[in-house]
Regions:
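P-loop/Walker A NTP-binding region and its immediately flanking N-terminal helices
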Residues: 1-171, 189
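Extended, largely alpha-helical regulatory/partner-binding modules appended to the mid-to-C-terminal parts
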Residues: 23, 83-87, 102-108, 118, ...
Length: 389
């Protein structure tokens, strides 16, 4: 049976975990110095390596031949944990096992000594989903666990955890993986799989994945199902993106105040089954790039794209004033909010573009122009503007 890429290339040692060196180096040192905590909390956005690091840690503390804090993956314990024939590492999904009874069963089970390794390790994923009663039941065990037990809690929403739980765990915050780091890993995997992944496509996948390497590998997997030669056009098609050309066409329509052309582009995208909500998000990200180049002197490091695309962004942004960009961002953010609450996505997008192409239609612009005119007249008369109501 075919194994998806993110499972096939899941790291088995800390050295293979990308973008989380601040976490892996600390964990390795703790294992080397035998300063292993009784409870760990791994928090961060999805796809950043929390569960992967938890599994590596569980193997490393039980490994018979651990070297430099890493599991050897060759001893009987490592192989048994990988194959599931040794049951000293228990993975629990708190989303479906979130009741008091589930935690009470866990507490009773934790009293048994490990069958083969040194520790019984409990990995509780999505721990924020536990009920209040379940947290209370877990509290005492976290405070005074048996010497042979280690808890590893993983969550994407650490703010939902009680302070009493947080204070009893050693916390590690997983960062979003940088696009440059992710694109390197994607190209490595593509090469191993016999794919041709160009630089533009790798950067685009990293941008869509938004810091989650698992998502990036899933997109790469989808693209490989279509073709072994992967370019940015294929990635855009697979991910349902409008593509750079469409975004630049739409921004040109705003510059020339051509609402008719904007409607035509939106209609073509809609007929080709592009997601209108996704298009709204893409426009926000596209205009955000304009905002960055117009406000930051050295903006290259803040924009995720190739050098050619960066030059295109700079050229296109010259057609907008900073005020225009901020106003457009406000309109699209407002449209996105309405779309998420159930409004018709296509209509909201069309309204936003018409307002941008026909500024006088927006009453907010009229009121702003009127206020500016009043302030200018006050300044000309020598009135202290700061004292005006």
């Amino acid at each position: 049976m075919y194994q998806v890429l993110y499972r096939k290339y899941r790291p088995k040692v800390f050295a293979d975990v990308y973008g989380q060196e601040h976490v892996t180096s600390t964990l390795k040192n703790e294992i080397k110095e035998n300063r292993i905590a009784h409870a760990y909390l791994f928090t961060g956005s999805r796809g950043t390596g929390k569960t992967t690091c938890a599994k590596i840690l569980a193997k490393a503390v039980n490994c018979e031949n651990s070297v430099d804090g890493e599991p050897c993956n060759e001893c009987e314990v490592c192989k048994g944990l990988d194959s599931g024939t040794i049951y000293d590492v228990v993975e629990i999904d708190a989303a479906s096992n979130n009741g008091v009874d589930n935690i009470r069963d866990l507490r009773e089970e934790a009293n048994y000594t490990p069958s083969r390794g040194k520790y019984r390790v409990y990995i509780i994923d999505e721990v924020h989903m536990l009920s209040t009663g379940a947290f209370n039941a877990l509290l005492k065990t976290l405070e005074e666990p048996p010497a042979h037990v280690i808890f590893i809690l993983a969550t994407t929403e650490v703010h939902k955890l009680p302070a009493t739980i947080l204070s009893r765990c050693q916390r590690f915050d997983f960062k979003r993986i940088q696009p440059e780091t992710m694109s390197v890993r994607l190209k490595q995997v593509a090469k191993l799989e016999g794919m041709e992944l160009d630089d533009d496509a790798a950067i685009l996948i990293a941008r869509i994945a938004d810091g989650a390497l698992r998502d990036g590998l899933s997109i790469l997997d989808q693209c490989a199902g279509r073709s072994k030669k992967i370019d940015s056009a294929l990635v855009s098609e697979v991910a349902g993106l409008a593509g750079r050309e469409a975004l630049y066409k739409l921004t040109d329509c705003i510059c020339t105040q051509n609402s008719s052309s904007a409607m035509t582009v939106i209609s073509e995208l809609y007929q080709n089954s592009y997601d209108m909500e996704r298009l709204c998000v893409e426009m926000i990200n596209h205009l955000r790039n304009f905002l960055i180049v117009k406000t930051v002197k050295d903006s290259r490091g803040l924009i995720i794209c190739t050098d050619d695309e960066y030059n295109s962004i700079i050229l296109s942004a010259e057609n907008f004033t900073l005020e225009n960009v901020i106003f457009a961002l406000d309109l699209f953010q407002d449209a996105l909010t309405k779309i998420k609450t159930g409004a018709n996505a296509r209509v909201e997008l069309e309204m936003a573009f018409v307002k941008l192409c026909e500024p006088k239609l927006d009453v907010n612009i009229d009121s702003l122009v009127d206020r500016i005119s009043k302030l200018e007249r006050a300044v000309n008369r020598g009135v202290n503007v700061s004292q005006q109501p």
